[in-house]
Amino acid sequence: MKLIVGLGNPGREYELTRHNIGFMAIDELAKRWNISLNEQKFKGVFGAGFVNGEKVILLKPLTYMNLSGESIRPLMDYYKIDVEDFVVLYDDLDIPVGKLRLRMKGSAGGHNGVKSTISHLGTQEFQRIRMGIDRPKNGMKVVDYVLGRFTSEEIPGVNHSIEKAADACEEWLNKPFLQIMNTFNS
């Protein structure tokens, strides 16, 4: 069984913001794999299905970004999901829009949703797909930037990174994460 989590904030006002690109990737996977995100439990919304013979759970924590681990850990405990069968998708300011970086482990890098996940799992050693949102320009505050919507110029790159993140998740169902890192980080 695999768990794929996209980080974001709940509520319509955050729907298409930069900080919610992880949620957008989960929506893409749900559409691709015909998985309904209709279960509400573990402080999140999730759905399960079978993809290429593998049971997959897709989760969007509804805790607000900074408390994401409060949703992830109880679901992992309930379904007895090992950390190596878990991947998290989230926004990253240090990566250009349209680009991805896959990592096997690491620090939170200033991302509060990842910080919460590390805190609740008790380890930094989990797989992640970092989706580029770039840095704010013209002195804009980071909080205003990540909670802002993508510009029309950014949308093609955003759609590309959502597609590539979904492709990476799909390959991960049948290949080691290290192998797909080599493919998608190049």
From Swiss-Prot:
GO terms under biological process: protein quality control for misfolded or incompletely synthesized proteins; rescue of stalled ribosome
GO cellular component: a single term: cytoplasm
InterPro entries: Pept_tRNA_hydro (IPR001328), Pept_tRNA_hydro_CS (IPR018171), Pept_tRNA_hydro_sf (IPR036416)
Coiled-coil features, chain-numbered ranges: none
Key words, A-Z: Cytoplasm, Hydrolase, RNA-binding, tRNA-binding
Top-level lineage group: Bacteria
Gene3D superfamilies: Peptidyl-tRNA hydrolase
Reactions accelerated catalytically: an N-acyl-L-alpha-aminoacyl-tRNA + H2O = an N-acyl-L-amino acid + a tRNA + H(+)
Chain positions of site Discriminates between blocked and unblocked aminoacyl-tRNA: N9
Site (Stabilizes the basic form of H active site to accept a proton): D91
Residues annotated as catalytic: H19
Binding, tRNA: Y14, Y64, N66, N112
Pfam families: Pept_tRNA_hydro
Keyword Cytoplasm among record annotations: yes
EC number, as in UniProt: 3.1.1.29
Subcellular location: Cytoplasm
GO-annotated molecular function: peptidyl-tRNA hydrolase activity; tRNA binding
UniProt enzyme class: hydrolase
Subunit note: Monomer.
Record-linked NCBIfam families: pth (TIGR00447)
Function, in words: Hydrolyzes ribosome-free peptidyl-tRNAs (with 1 or more amino acids incorporated), which drop off the ribosome during protein synthesis, or as a result of ribosome stalling. Catalyzes the release of premature peptidyl moieties from peptidyl-tRNA molecules trapped in stalled 50S ribosomal subunits, and thus maintains levels of free tRNAs and 50S ribosomes.
Family, per entry: Belongs to the PTH family.
Protein's name according to its UniProt entry: Peptidyl-tRNA hydrolase
Organism name: Bacillus cereus (strain ATCC 10987 / NRS 248)
Lineage: Bacteria, Bacillati, Bacillota, Bacilli, Bacillales
Gene: pth
